[in-house]
């Protein structure tokens, strides 16, 4: 399977089947998680009452924001060291999607924060700020790529930024432990395993899986488009050369 | 490793930093200007001013490091100096670090040194704390300059890339800004903050030069 | 000199894309000590790009470059800072390269004595070129890569440069220069892009 | 007066302003970045934030106008464009005004348009006032750009004159900043403030172009 | 053309200081339609400075300049923005000067068709020069001030430029050009600094 990710041709074949599967399975998981979250699980008054149901979007979105940036950094690293074109294509595909999920995390967090903490936004909160800047990093990555004149240079510049920006990910993850924050500390992904009640935990994990699958499917679709675009550019160049 | 080219890079950058007019006086002017404009907008309530003072100094440091750095590497690309540095045989990361350090000495450190004065302008009580803060500002601004250098190197081929630099560099500033203000406000959990600030600066000094070197090679291509 | 010496530079199969278009491909050359290759080609053919590639500044899309010898590179842009006078500029690079050549002598040889203390920003076009060429004399390096070396030089400057280059070739150095005019030094081969 | 060269200057400057990457998105990023760093330093007390919000927006506008303007005229000197503009026959003051206006449209106006959003981030109450303030920010930033243009033109021959610009331009910004924040806070004596702000902007638009033209002629000499 | 026409340019007693030193003094010249004056002088003699003075860009320390005719100025720096392609550059100046010349034809004449849509930042040295010369054809102006016009041009480019200049002179235009090489167009007089 891994070889399929190294070779564009094999990747196209693999993703033609995998992307729809990912969409389908992802949507199923998300819908099931939402159904559980919105109608089945009991509300938790300590977490703001019914508004806590936004958790089933907020937490998966937060996870994906961090995972997608890590993916961007890893893909950039792979491209930088081994020059696998597919790694660059993956990085380019991840950035806008990562930005969307990060924005989703911020939006749902704010919506949840207004009733529970009494504020949409807390400026000196390290967690919120670091997630906001993660969004900035994604946007900066895209702006930087867009301002370069050739694909090769865009890839190199983007890779440098993505690798350097990876400092932010641990900061996000551990910000709640390092600083006083309004935000609760991690209760799912912790060193001693999950501490959340199972009623919440199962739908949350299923939702998380669903978001990951949907994200993966979208990344594959973006990559397919990009591979085809690069092919067209190459063929056009060859045709012009005569 | 032969230190001569690195030392030469440092000297050239330092001369360049001072050449554009009155050297360190200018960043001071910039900081002073910001310090004057802020209370104008805010009003002169003593309590408010005291509360915002340190924050404003941090922000001024961050912004003026951006303004200073915008041209460093871009100028090198435009006048052909970068080609020469890339071919000295010295590790480019060391050259980039030397240049950044020179610009920090010329423009960043004077700002940090001026910070107690500014704090007083913001109605802070004169105390030994101000001197301690000076050290924090100096540390933090060093990290700003290194991360800013990465942004500057990345956008060196893009004319008027100054604003692109901001977008790239600001997220990199965040850890430093967070630890720095935490160390200053001295709230709960701030015991380790000066150490964390130092660590984040050290990290910047260790990682940023390699990123700069890669970005500069790209800019020459 | 029929003893087979190792080449100072050899390249093969060089190719580069510029803006989705192949600028050149399949370029190869070998340079032995004492040889001078002149690059020819219309404006925009890729001479500057090829020279930058040989200097290690631009990455080729395909092909190999072996450059065992140290080199000097003088491009269209001279690499002089606006605040640097020719004297300061040379002192800086002497320091960086660990050279102990006499800067006063070099300034003299390039007829830069009068302009020696004028900041880079105010130098005339020819004075800037001369300052760049002065770097060639700071440190002896076998390989010189020169992009349109005659640009902006007056007649005396061209003669002086020809002498410097001829001397370099006689003492076992080699050069590759891009040019639009006739060369005033012995040319081994011409490569046309 | 023949308007063609002036219109051409405007178009060229506008294209230049957008060329360096993603155009108006970038100054927005700058302003956003500044707005974000400030509270990091200040803390998040709602009352304090509300008090400093407008001041911070003014300062960010001023600083980002400086960052934008630094390179305008300097680039023209370096690439020879200034020589061409000086010889069009059109009044240089009009050309300079057109260029400044273009840069304001590309970088200043978007900032002003984003100000209500920023104000909300600073805990301001959503109200029609925010729209009125938008107008004040737009007016004020226009003055900032014109005065900043004078500073940029004066320091156009000095490489790395960016900080020199700040020193020259910041004092010129003060009246605008005073009237602007007065108009916004609506304290005693603030009735006439919007008028005074408009007057100071008008004054900048009327006077600055001539100063710029003279400074540019000097830069080419 | 022995009819005494008004000169397109006349200057007398021009002098300038540069860094406490008199760069030149007492320079005067008169240019009638159809005449070409070549400025000669060593590097740093002041040719660029004199041309800028005649173009009205630099203020003379002493002396008078009368320039009743419109002029074009092409200096060492081409005045092309990094983001401007040759086509956009020419369209801009056509607009600014109110010219209705066909830009496609001019690009063709200067062999810039291939580079017409490459941003200024990526143009080769010769392509930049050609773009600047294209401005000469945008609008007919009697007086051309050219600083080292042959710089960076290939052989075809020089021939093309010579033809353009000769044509300009035949139709009653005049030029002043600084040069280090022999001119490929009929020269009326040489002025040495
Ligand atoms: C804009 C504001 C917010 C941001 C940027 C944010 C960000 C994040 C991030 C990055 C995570 C992942 C942490 C990890 O896996 O270690 C997370 C998880 C979580 N967030 Fe938020 N959040 C915000 C607001 C809120 C609010 C208002 C609440 C509820 C009061 C909340 C409740 C949670 C919960 C329960 C988790 C799961 C943590 C766990 O169990 O591991 N968040 N959030
Ligand atoms: N991004 C790009 N898109 C399209 N074309 C490009 C791009 N970058 C460079 N080029 C083209 O590549 C070529 C670069 O040529 P180079 O500067 O090497 O030419 P040269 O042979 O040195 O010419 P000259 O004699 O004019 O100095 C030019 O034709 C230029 O137009
Ligand atoms: N501020 C200054 N201080 C000292 N000398 C200066 C200053 N500004 C200019 N100069 C000198 O004035 C002269 C300017 O000459 P200019 O550029 O006109 O020469 P040129 O004849 O065009 O030379 P080239 O053939 O090299 O282009 C140079 O010799 C330069 O060193
Ligand atoms: Mg070339
Ligand atoms: Mg000259």
From Swiss-Prot, chains C, E:
Belongs to the ABC transporter superfamily. CcmA exporter (TC 3.A.1.107) family. This is Cytochrome c biogenesis ATP-binding export protein CcmA. It is found in: Cell inner membrane. Disulfide bonds: none annotated. The gene is ccmA. It is a peripheral membrane protein. It is an enzyme of class 7 (translocase). It comes from Hyphomonas neptunium (strain ATCC 15444). Gene3D superfamilies: P-loop containing nucleotide triphosphate hydrolases. ATP binds at residues 41-48. Its EC number is 7.6.2.5.
